[in-house]
Amino acid sequence: MKRFIFICLLGVFLFGSIQIPLNSQTMDEILKEITQAHGGKAAIENIKDMKITGTIEVPQQELKVSFTQYKKEPDKRRIEMKVMGMVQIQGFDGKTAWELNPQTGKAIEIPGEDAIDIKRGSLALAWILDPKKYGISLVYKGREKIDGKYYLVLEQVYSDGDKSILYIDPETYLTFKIKSKMLDEMMVEVETETYLSDYKSVKGYIMAHKMISYLRGKEYMRIIYKKVKPNTRLRDHLFLMQK
């Protein structure tokens, strides 16, 4: 279960930052508009790293844990959380995804699909400025009405073929909902819906601070960012797999 929680946390961080709606405007016009809506090019590029503290709740299991997440641009990440008295640590150094076994104290490399998900969750914030550079393509699929309001529907496709459906508020250009697929703790592919809200400025950069995910129609996970501290001068060794 813990790896599933880690993957969910990585996913909502990526999608909760910036997404791109398309319409009759040109791509360049859309990129310029969305970039400005999220603080502008300078604000995005000014974020060198982040330290995020918050909580994760899994209502169906009556589980609530605190976490600390470190993100260094362009592609490094480390997540620490305490579950049932044990500290779980997972990281990505730009090349290798790994996790620390709390019982042995040794780090092991994470293989397969989980490693791909972790790498994707460590994507640079600046991908918005040049999606193609990061292997991302976007297709506008029209509009869809949700609770009486129309949202722009965007299909986001990564270079490995993985897809997500994004629902964009046409008034704010912020992500309202994400529909995606992932493997659950039983390694069964499931569809999840994540609602993002409580957007706040972090040194001029706009990102969601509250994410609620639903699995099979029921609330599965609630992630709250309590504090986001940018530009803390994180060192690379923090993200390396311990030998």
Q: Which sequence ranges carry the predicted segments?
A:
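Positively charged n-region of N-terminal signal peptides that target proteins for export
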Residues: 1-4
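Bacterial N-terminal signal peptides
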Residues: 7-17
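Bacterial Sec-dependent signal peptides at the C-terminal "C-region" and cleavage site
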Residues: 15-25
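N-terminal mature ectodomain segment of secretory-pathway/periplasmic proteins
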Residues: 23, 28-105, 139-140
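Flexible, processing/modification-adjacent segments and terminal tails
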Residues: 23-36, 43, 96-162, 183-190, ...
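Short amphipathic beta-strand/extended segments with alternating polar/hydrophobic composition
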Residues: 65-68, 89-94, 108-115, 168, ...
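Structural motif
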Residues: 83, 146-147, 202
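Gly/Pro-enriched, hydrophobic low-complexity segments
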Residues: 150-241
